């Protein structure tokens, strides 16, 4: 697979990080390395740590960043483990971190990966091909109620009960093995009015199953909290999200970390000792310009939130 990928909100991310030429930065979702390449171009004696759970992405990034090889350390891991990653590298706090939480275009476009509802492929959806849980396992073996729950909670799919019931009916007779088989089942469970809508009928369900396979939302919360704890004072954290579930988690983590004293107003003095960890730099998330959306439609749903360690 050719891992060419158009980075979203590239200039906005670089501005947000306020890169120091001698600083240490971490890209927790390396992907096509577009953001990382631009970070490297702003470094002199500094260092970039690139993290991705997808070995294909890491190999592609290694080639793309070859001119900056002396500045770059690549790590095969999940960004939720950012604390352990830094510790293993002999680091505690660094100058900035970037997380682009969207699935990269090459992953979506590679039919074999099973992320797309537009091409036939085995039900896989693993970002890390070394993990055991796949979309096949979820679709064929998870209880109907659990399926309904993930479709509703992770995909915000209004027809979750009907889709879960349809999946259960089919898998009772035979295993559901491919993406287009699943698409047909989803279509069969939806009313004609829903099938006429602009959005593809399988979009929400595929998002939900992908999130469950990769534990994406759990990784977001854990990763963001760890990232804040491992920033130097003045260090920046920039996070791009692509759907409301992720954005809500990032927003809540930021707001919680920005809080100071939590003692009741009736207390004459603070006894909790809590102080803000960060200052939120984006009251509202930064979104793509009209020009970027026209050039890269994927950027339409992107939101960038930025915080600074205090």
What residue spans do the PLM features occupy?
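S-adenosyl-L-methionine-dependent methyltransferase catalytic core, i.e., the SAM/SAH-binding region
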Residues: 1-310
């Amino acid at each position: 697979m050719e891992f060419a990928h158009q980075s979203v909100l590239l200039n906005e991310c670089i501005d947000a990080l306020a890169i120091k030429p001698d600083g240490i930065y971490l890209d927790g979702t390396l992907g096509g390395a577009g953001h990382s390449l631009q970070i490297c171009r702003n470094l002199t004696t500094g260092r970039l740590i690139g993290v991705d759970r997808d070995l294909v992405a890491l190999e592609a990034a290694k080639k793309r960043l070859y001119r900056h090889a002396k500045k770059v350390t690549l790590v095969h891991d999940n960004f939720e483990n950012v604390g352990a990653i830094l510790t293993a590298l002999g680091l505690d706090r660094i100058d900035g971190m970037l997380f682009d939480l969207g699935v990269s275009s090459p992953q979506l476009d590679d039919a074999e990966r099973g992320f797309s509802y537009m091409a036939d492929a085995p039900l896989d959806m693993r970002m890390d091909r070394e993990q055991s849980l796949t979309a096949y396992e979820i679709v064929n073996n998870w209880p109907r109620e659990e399926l309904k729950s993930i479709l509703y909670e992770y995909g915000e799919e209004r027809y979750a009960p009907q889709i879960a019931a349809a999946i259960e009916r089919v898998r009772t007779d035979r295993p559901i093995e491919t993406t287009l088989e699943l698409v047909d089942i989803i279509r069969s469970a939806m009313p004609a009015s829903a099938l006429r809508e602009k959005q593809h009928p399988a979009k929400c369900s595929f998002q939900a199953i992908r999130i469950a396979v990769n534990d994406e939302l759990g990784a977001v919360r854990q990763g963001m909290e760890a990232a804040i704890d491992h920033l130097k004072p003045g260090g920046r954290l920039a996070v791009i999200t692509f759907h409301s579930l992720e954005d809500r988690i990032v927003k809540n983590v930021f707001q919680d970390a920005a809080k100071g004293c939590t003692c009741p107003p009736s207390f004459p003095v603070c006894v909790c000792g809590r102080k803000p960890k960060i200052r939120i730099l984006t009251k509202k998330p930064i979104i793509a310009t009209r020009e970027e959306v026209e050039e890269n439609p994927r950027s339409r749903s992107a939101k960038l939130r930025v915080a600074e360690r205090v």
